[in-house]
Regions:
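TPR-adjacent "capping" and linker segments in tetratricopeptide-repeat scaffold/adaptor proteins
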Residues: 2-17, 79-80, 111
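Alpha-helical segment of the N-proximal tetratricopeptide repeat
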Residues: 13-40, 105-108
Length: 166
């Protein structure tokens, strides 16, 4: 096991700049750094929604294959979001990115890709019902999932494998 450190806290005055840095590192495709900075912000400002959203996105940026551990961590953060709309929308985003991670694996994982994308569409439908006027982000994501399912010819997996009779 590695060495144990006591993490240092940033000052309240540094929160806004730290959130900017987290967003910057995420856009530079450095999700681990964005995750770390977001956690530092949330340690001193647990109600900082922007830092929480960046954390969720940074965790989903790290999905490979199913990304189950990162997905659980992302979903834990989703439950802390303030509105039902955000909870539904970002739960959809987590499911969508899990599905897309499965899709990138190919082979049998494609059936899991379908499930992730279909689950995302369900969350996006719920978010769409809760949206503010003029905010169609959930529709845009729903359409992207639908297009991927159709383009890739994804199908749900069979629950019961067929028995081979000889």
């Amino acid at each position: 096991m590695g060495e144990h450190f006591t993490l240092k806290h940033i000052s309240n005055d540094a929160v806004a700049r730290a959130v900017e840095r987290a967003e910057h590192y995420r856009l530079l495709n450095d999700p681990e750094q964005a995750e770390s900075i977001s956690l530092d912000v949330l340690a001193v400002d647990s109600n900082n929604t922007k830092a929480r959203v960046i954390l969720i996105l940074a965790l989903t940026d790290q999905f490979t294959g199913g990304g189950s551990h990162a997905a659980r961590r992302a979903l834990e953060q989703v439950t802390q979001l303030p509105s039902d709309y955000e909870k539904a929308y970002y739960a959809g985003l987590v499911a969508e990115r899990q599905g897309r991670a499965h899709l990138s694996q190919g082979g049998m994982a494609r059936a899991f890709a379908y499930e992730g994308l279909h689950e995302a569409m369900t969350h996006y439908e719920r978010a769409d019902a809760l949206k503010q006027p003029g905010v169609d982000d959930a529709i845009l994501r729903w359409n992207a999932c639908a297009r991927t399912i159709m383009r890739e010819g994804l199908q749900p997996r069979d629950d019961e494998p067929e028995m081979q009779l000889e």
